[in-house]
Curated annotation (Swiss-Prot):
5-phospho-alpha-D-ribose 1-diphosphate binds at residues 94, 97-98, 102, 104-107, 122-130, 134. Pathway: Amino-acid biosynthesis; L-tryptophan biosynthesis; L-tryptophan from chorismate: step 2/5. Its cofactor is Mg(2+). SUPFAM superfamilies: Nucleoside phosphorylase/phosphoribosyltransferase catalytic domain, Nucleoside phosphorylase/phosphoribosyltransferase N-terminal domain. This is Anthranilate phosphoribosyltransferase. GO terms for cellular component: cytosol. The keyword Glycosyltransferase applies. Disulfide bonds: none annotated.
Amino acid sequence: MIRKAIARVVERQDLSEAEMIEVMDQVMSGGATPAQIASFITALRMKGETVDEITGAARVMRDRALPIRVGKSVLGIDRDDINLDRETILDTCGTGGSGTNSFNISTTVAFIVSACGVKVAKHGNRAVSSSCGSADVLEALGVNLDVTPEVVERSIAQIGIGFLFAPALHGAMKHAIGPRREIGIRTIFNILGPLTNPAGADCQVLGVYREDLVEKLAQVLKKLGCRSGFVVHGSDGMDEITLTGESTVAEITADGVKLSKVTPEQFGLERAPLTELHGGDAQGNAVIVRDILSGKDGAKRRIVLLNAGYALVATGKAKDVAEGIRLAAETIDSGAAMKQLERLVALTNEAE
């Protein structure tokens, strides 16, 4: 199948979701050669991946992931577009690869949202383009990444947050590692991670490194069963809602996908230059995360509050972003968010 798929994609013909599933099954089962994998993902990148193609690939990755089973939780605020009888799990995993050298914003957000009573299954990996990915900063903060799926499940169930280390849960990806590394360009695999949470997160805030991916990945998440969420991109290139200027936001609701542009001023937040949002290596970013969770003021706190505000809307904990920002600020200042970090560090290290 992959040889036929390569020939079609080279001719700029789109594959159906079913055809993409067949190709990715071949890739992830070891049935395709490294040359075939490299040729296929390069041709796909040049053509441009469609919603159906990304959806099909994500379904295969989800099916082959080691599952993380999480018990049911109940939302704190009744929103008409969210079914309270269903499980609510949030992921704040983004694509990375923004090249803006920002600190770990979505990881910081995860602790705040979990302290608000939302179960968070934070999916992540080591650095893509920066010097510090979510796994790197969590390790520097003292979180033990080398734990069993059962420990991750217990962590989410008992304290409301767990880290899903992608390499440990997506073993079938090993067949694509070599070709991806050797061709050295962004491909469909750079956007699949946030779409394939092994805990089946049904609420997401997903940051992307290209504006044209915003609506596309929102449509993919909708097809994959996401009940509520946002796909976001900053005009400065950040895979977050930025403080430097305008951001593109796609909201996912029961009614579909709605695209909008937002600025910090809409929420009473002062803009900041990108330099004030820069991070560093894992140890430096760990200091930044601790500072924010300890209540330190400044641009880094503001961008975390803004993104946390959206996450709290996605999960139904806030009626709007302004309320979400207020709740996030209160949660930090009460010490509850820092407590979540301390509990995650303790639980993952007890498991050794």
